[in-house]
């Protein structure tokens, strides 16, 4: 297994991952789709451990999109059970690895049981100072921007602020990800080359990395390869390279 060079790399502060390909991985092995999701939890453990070792500021994982509610109810029920199980089983690890848990997305469609486990894990990790582990559950970029717009519009209507106060900084502070650095590197597994309504505001200047590997087979070396690719890219943010 390749060791992780902690000091020799230009590391991203914030990595966001679209964990795609669980179902395809399972179907290719004549397994039920839910077995792909179950195996995917092992990969979650792998990348969170590595993010903690590297002392990344934040790791955001796309667990359930706001569009995923269109899936069969049995699969959705299993995903919710898997999330609960993960939070219970990994609570101590998250705490001991000095990680902080954060949840982004809607809460009104999640069960009380899921919300309770999220709250418990947030509580035991809230004073930690290491990597922030952000779980995007019932999350969609358009939904987030719509909720933020309504919130600011309500504040203007109620006289709490003026239109002139609405700036990029205020928008940033009003999103689910308030206080987090913008995404530097977005990784998508599973072979599809699209962003799927994920962190639309936050990935404005992110480097995008797509791999054909499905999420259950994404390993430490694969994460390292994405980080190596990021380290070799020139990030211009609309400007020019020095000497260009």
Swiss-Prot record:
One of its GO terms (molecular function) is magnesium ion binding. One of its GO terms (biological process) is polyprenol biosynthetic process. InterPro entries: UPP_synth-like (IPR001441), UPP_synth-like_CS (IPR018520), UPP_synth-like_sf (IPR036424). Belongs to the UPP synthase family. Catalyzes the condensation of isopentenyl diphosphate (IPP) with allylic pyrophosphates generating different type of terpenoids. Homodimer. This is Isoprenyl transferase. It comes from Rhodopirellula baltica (strain DSM 10527 / NCIMB 13988 / SH1). The lineage of its organism: Bacteria, Pseudomonadati, Planctomycetota, Planctomycetia, Pirellulales.
């Amino acid at each position: 297994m390749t060791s992780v060079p902690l000091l020799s790399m230009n590391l991203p502060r914030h990595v966001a991952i679209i964990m795609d390909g669980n179902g395809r991985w399972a179907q290719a092995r004549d397994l039920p789709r839910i077995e792909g999701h179950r195996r995917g939890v092992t990969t979650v453990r792998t990348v969170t451990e590595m993010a903690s070792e590297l002392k990344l500021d934040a790791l955001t994982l796309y667990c359930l999109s706001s569009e995923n509610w269109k899936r069969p109810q049995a699969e959705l029920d299993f995903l919710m059970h898997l999330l609960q199980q993960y939070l219970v089983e990994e609570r101590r690890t998250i705490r001991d690895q000095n990680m902080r848990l954060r949840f982004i997305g809607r809460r009104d469609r999640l069960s009380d049981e899921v919300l309770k486990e999220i709250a418990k894990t947030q509580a035991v990790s809230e004073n930690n100072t290491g990597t922030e582990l952000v779980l995007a559950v019932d999350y969609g970029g358009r939904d987030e921007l719509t909720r933020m717009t309504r919130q600011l519009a309500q504040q203007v209507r109620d006289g709490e602020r003026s239109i002139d106060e609405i700036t990029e900084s205020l928008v940033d502070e009003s999103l689910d990800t308030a206080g987090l650095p913008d995404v530097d590197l977005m990784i998508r597994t599973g072979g599809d080359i699209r962003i799927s309504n994920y962190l639309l505001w936050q990935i404005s200047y992110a480097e995008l990395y797509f791999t054909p590997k499905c999420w259950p087979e994404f390993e430490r070396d694969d994460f390292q390869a994405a980080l190596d690719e990021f380290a070799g890219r020139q990030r211009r943010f609309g400007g020019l390279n020095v000497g260009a």
